C-alpha cells in the first residue's frame, strides 16, 4: 500500500478549505487520508508515503504499466539478463531532467551516477550519506535485496550493471516498486556539503511527473507539473494538491462540494450514496489485498502457539466483515489473496470455537483477565476501512474467553515506527501486493529477513524460511508454486497472523476526472490523469 500553486483567488488557507477547486481547471485536488511520514520512498512501506513521493516526484529503472502489473521501461529504456540470471545490464534513458526548485538546481541530466548512489546508499551501512543521515530501508531488506545484490557498477554514463549473489526471479519487478525510486546524486552531494542530509526526506528531488513545492503536515501537499518530464504525454495537470483529512465523512463532503476531485478510502456505507450523486463516479475492482492481525511472537504469552490458536479461533470474522466491510469484503483464510498465483485454496480456518479457545488458554497456563495490547490504525486502508471498529469487535470476542484487550492507537507514522520496533502485542495491519510475485507476501511479510521490517509478527521459522528462499531462487513457475504452497501450510499451522478479509477497492471521483486508473497495488497515481474543461 503523495500537490501546487493555485490561482491567486484560492491561495488563502481559508478559501482553500471552503471554495470549490473546480474553477482551477488544471488543478486536481486529492482528498487524501493521512499525512506521509516523509518523502524518501526507500524509508517506507505504506501507500500513504508512496503516493506522496514515489508516485508523484520520482521514477524507477523499470515501472509497472499504469493500472496493470506488467513491467515496462522506466528510467532504463532497455535491459538484458545473463544466461545464468546473475547479471542485469540496464541501458539508461538519455536526456532525463531532475527537478529544478528553489532549493536545488541541477547542472546535469540523470545518469549512471544517480543509480549507483541510490542503491549503494541502500546496500552499505557505512555509506557517507547513511552516516550523515542514518535511516532504515525496510522494504529493500524485506525483499532480501541487501543480500541478493553483490555489486553495482557503470560501464559508461548510460549503462549500469547489477551483479547478483543469487538468482532472484522477481528482480526486474522489484526494481519497479516504489522503494526503488532513483535519487539525484548531485542533490545528495549538495545536502552533505550543507550539512542537511535529512532534507532528502523533507524536500525531495526526482525526475517524476510532478515537482514538490511544499508540505504542511495534516493539511496539504502541493506539487507543480514537471514541464521537462521525459514522458510529456503523462503530464496533463498544471497543479496537484493533496488535501489531507483523516475523517472519511469530511472527505466525502469535500468531494460532493467540488473541493476535491478525487477522494481516498471511502467508507463502505457511503458507496451507494456516492453512486447516486450525478456529479460523481465510483470506480471499483477486486482488491489485491489482505487485512489481518499480526501477533508479536516475541512477546509473552503470544510466543505460545496455543495462545495464538486460541485468539485466532475466538474471533468472529464473519461479524467483522459484515460490520466493518459492509458488503465490500470477502472472508480471508490464507496469508495472501486469492488472486495471487500460488495461492493454496485448500487452506482453511480453524472453526470459530470460543469454548475450545478457553480450553487452549487453560492448557497454556493463561489466567483469566490477562491483558494484551491490541493496536489499531487511525487511518483507513484499502484492506481495512475501520480498524478501530475491528479492534472493538475483537476486544469483545477475546473478552468472552477471558482475555482483556487494551486498544492502543497512534498517528500513522508513529504507529509504523513503533510497530517496527516491536512495541505492540497484537496489531491490526493490512497489505496490498506491490509487484504480483508471491514473495511480496510470503517473503516480505513473514520471513526471517523481514523481522525488522514488515514482518510485524516478528516470526522466524527456519523450515518456512527455507521454502520461501528456495522458491525465490527458482525460475520454474511450477516449482515455485509447490514450494510456496508448502510454506503456506506451515504459516497456517503456526498462526503468526489471523487473516481477516480481502476487500473490494472503491475509488470515488468527480465526473470531470479523465483517464484515472486504479492501481492493482493500492497506490494512487495521477500521471496521465486530466480534468475535462
Cite the ranges covered by each PLM segment.
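Aromatic- and charge-enriched surface segment that lines or borders ligand/interaction sites
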Residues: 77-129, 161, 301
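Surface-exposed binding/hinge segments that line
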Residues: 91, 123-188
Amino acid at each position: 500500500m503523495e500537490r501546487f500553486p493555485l490561482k491567486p483567488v484560492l491561495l488563502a488557507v481559508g478559501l482553500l478549505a471552503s471554495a470549490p477547486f473546480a474553477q482551477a481547471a488544471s488543478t486536481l485536488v486529492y482528498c487524501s487520508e493521512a499525512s506521509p511520514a516523509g518523502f524518501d520512498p526507500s524509508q517506507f512501506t505504506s501507500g500513504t508515503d508512496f503516493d506522496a513521493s514515489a508516485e508523484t516526484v520520482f521514477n524507477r529503472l523499470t515501472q509497472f504499466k499504469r493500472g496493470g502489473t506488467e513491467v515496462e521501461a522506466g528510467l532504463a529504456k532497455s535491459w538484458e539478463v545473463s544466461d545464468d540470471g546473475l547479471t542485469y545490464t540496464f541501458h539508461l534513458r538519455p536526456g532525463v531532467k531532475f527537478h529544478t526548485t528553489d532549493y536545488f538546481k541541477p547542472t546535469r541530466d540523470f545518469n549512471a551516477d544517480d543509480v549507483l548512489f541510490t542503491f549503494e546508499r541502500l546496500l552499505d551501512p557505512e555509506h557517507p550519506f547513511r552516516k550523515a543521515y542514518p535511516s532504515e530501508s525496510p522494504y529493500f531488506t524485506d525483499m532480501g535485496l541487501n543480500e541478493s545484490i553483490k555489486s553495482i557498477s557503470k560501464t559508461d554514463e548510460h549503462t549500469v550493471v547489477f551483479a547478483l549473489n543469487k538468482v532472484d526471479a522477481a528482480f526486474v519487478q522489484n526494481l519497479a516498486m516504489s522503494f526503488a525510486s532513483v535519487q539525484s546524486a548531485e542533490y545528495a552531494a549538495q545536502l552533505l556539503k550543507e550539512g542537511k542530509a535529512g532534507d532528502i526526506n523533507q524536500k525531495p528531488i526526482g525526475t517524476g511527473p510532478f515537482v514538490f513545492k511544499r508540505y504542511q503536515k495534516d493539511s496539504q501537499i502541493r506539487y507543480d507539473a514537471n514541464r521537462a518530464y521525459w514522458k510529456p504525454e503523462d503530464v496533463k495537470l498544471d497543479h496537484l494538491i493533496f488535501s489531507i483529512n483523516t475523517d472519511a465523512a469530511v472527505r466525502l463532503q469535500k468531494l460532493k462540494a467540488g473541493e476535491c476531485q478525487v477522494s481516498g478510502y471511502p467508507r463502505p456505507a457511503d458507496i451507494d450514496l456516492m453512486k447516486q450523486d450525478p456529479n460523481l463516479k465510483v470506480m471499483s475492482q477486486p482488491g489485491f489485498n489482505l487485512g489481518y492481525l499480526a501477533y508479536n511472537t516475541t512477546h509473552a504469552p503470544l510466543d505460545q502457539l496455543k495462545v495464538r490458536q486460541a485468539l485466532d479461533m475466538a474471533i468472529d470474522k464473519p461479524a467483522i466483515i459484515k460490520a466493518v466491510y459492509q458488503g465490500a469484503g470477502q472472508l480471508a483464510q490464507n496469508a495472501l489473496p486469492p488472486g495471487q498465483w500460488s495461492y493454496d485454496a485448500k487452506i482453511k480456518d480453524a472453526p470459530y470455537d470460543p469454548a475450545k479457545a478457553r480450553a487452549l488458554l487453560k492448557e497454556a497456563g493463561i489466567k483469566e483477565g490477562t491483558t494484551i495490547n491490541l493496536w489499531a490504525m487511525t487511518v483507513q486502508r484499502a484492506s481495512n476501512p475501520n480498524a478501530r471498529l475491528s479492534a472493538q469487535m475483537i476486544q469483545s470476542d477475546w473478552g468472552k474467553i477471558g482475555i482483556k484487550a487494551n486498544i492502543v492507537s497512534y498517528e500513522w507514522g508513529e504507529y509504523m515506527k513503533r510497530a517496527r520496533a516491536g512495541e505492540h502485542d497484537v496489531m491490526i495491519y493490512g497489505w496490498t501486493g506491490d509487484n504480483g510475485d508471491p514473495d511480496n507476501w510470503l517473503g516480505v511479510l513473514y520471513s526471517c529477513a523481514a523481522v525488522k521490517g514488515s514482518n510485524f509478527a516478528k516470526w522466524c521459522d527456519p523450515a518456512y524460511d527455507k521454502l520461501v528462499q528456495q522458491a525465490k531462487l527458482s525460475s520454474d513457475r511450477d516449482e515455485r508454486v509447490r514450494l510456496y504452497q508448502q510454506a503456506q501450510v506451515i504459516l497456517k499451522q503456526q498462526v503468526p497472523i489471523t487473516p481477516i478479509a480481502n476487500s473490494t477497492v472503491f475509488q470515488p471521483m468527480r465526473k470531470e476526472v479523465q483517464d484515472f486508473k486504479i492501481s492493482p497495488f493500492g497506490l494512487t497515481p495521477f500521471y496521465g490523469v486530466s480534468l475535462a474543461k
